[in-house]
């Protein structure tokens, strides 16, 4: 199988290389593409050195089976036809096509079969905060239909990119040295602070990040449930966390949901309050699953449950989810059979 990665030098592109190798993804030839800045850079994959090629409007994608793209929405829109015109399936990590009615938005644990209907040859990877949430919500939806969702996210600096993570390190150093901190990648100093804004504000007072969770959840889960989100940037490095309040049609017990999490795909139960055992970002970098803890009844709503999630947003929230989509296609799509 011929596989391509567009945006190979970025944080998610590098995660693609690790995940493809970890999971022994079937690759006969791997092609790496990037911008003028990264073209010529060499990376080693399974003992072979591969040079990043300049992404151009040509026939470089002829014969490619699957192309993972993570180079920003503008690049994805600009190069979508170039990538797919010879039959490659484009699995895109940007926001460019997520709400396009002709592009499925897929989290394999929830709606893998949607990936079969792709008139444009494109499958969209959802936003990282949405991915981790719907993996857990699907386990609850399987017990009783979810009517309403409230979520507060606590998102790591790396969600804003490698340069943002470097800025957080530098801010901590500067503050501890008594220097004025550099503020470029965030609206305010993030070190020793939290910022209740991710992306720009929309006319309804919610940010674009918060509205992504509203719209994407409906599309992925095929649900009428509304999702009200509050997205906050916190001074951790990697792994996002979420506090969720979900209302179901019938009351669901704590034990019912715990059992569903134990048996759910892509989920790991970590919930022992007596031992102070619950998911935390510090300990979950590089983990595949969405970790669930602090499960309890919502004391304000007899049909409500409250729980806490942590997941590596660069892994499951980006590269891993895309690779899992590709794995599902290889096993289930006639295009890849034989």
Regions found by a protein language model. Name each.
Residues 67, 157-338:
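Charged docking surfaces used in two-component/phosphorelay signaling
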């Amino acid at each position: 199988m011929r596989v391509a990665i567009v945006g190979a030098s970025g944080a998610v592109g590098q995660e693609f290389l690790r995940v493809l190798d970890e999971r022994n993804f079937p690759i006969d030839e791997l092609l790496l593409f990037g911008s003028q800045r990264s073209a010529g850079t060499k990376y080693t994959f399974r003992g072979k050195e591969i040079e990043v090629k300049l992404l151009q409007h040509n026939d470089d994608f002829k014969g490619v089976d699957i192309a993972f793209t993570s180079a920003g929405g503008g690049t994805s829109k600009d190069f979508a036809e170039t990538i797919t015109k010879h039959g490659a399936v484009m699995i895109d990590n940007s926001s460019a096509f997520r709400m396009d009615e002709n592009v499925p938005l897929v989290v394999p644990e929830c709606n893998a079969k949607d990936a079969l209907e792709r008139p444009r040859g494109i499958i969209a990877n959802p936003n990282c905060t949405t991915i981790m949430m719907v993996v857990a919500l699907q386990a609850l939806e399987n017990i009783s239909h979810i009517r309403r969702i409230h979520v507060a996210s606590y998102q790591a600096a790396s969600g804003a990119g490698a340069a943002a993570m470097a800025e957080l390190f530098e801010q901590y150093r500067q503050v501890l040295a008594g220097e004025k901190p550099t503020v470029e990648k965030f609206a305010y100093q993030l070190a020793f602070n939290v910022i209740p804004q991710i992306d720009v504000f929309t006319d309804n007072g919610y940010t674009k990040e918060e509205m992504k969770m509203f719209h994407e959840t409906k599309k992925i889960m095929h649900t009428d449930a509304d999702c009200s989100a509050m997205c906050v940037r916190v001074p951790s490095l990697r792994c996002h966390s979420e506090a969720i309040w979900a209302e179901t049609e019938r009351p669901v017990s704590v034990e019912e949901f715990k059992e569903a999490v134990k048996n759910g795909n892509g989920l790991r139960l970590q919930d022992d309050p007596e031992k102070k055992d619950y998911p935390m970002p510090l300990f979950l970098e590089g983990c595949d699953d969405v970790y669930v803890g602090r499960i309890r009844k919502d004391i304000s709503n007899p049909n409500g449950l409250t729980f806490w999630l942590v997941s590596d947003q660069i892994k499951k929230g980006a590269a891993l989810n895309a690779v899992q989509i590709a794995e599902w296609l290889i096993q289930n799509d006639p295009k890849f059979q034989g």
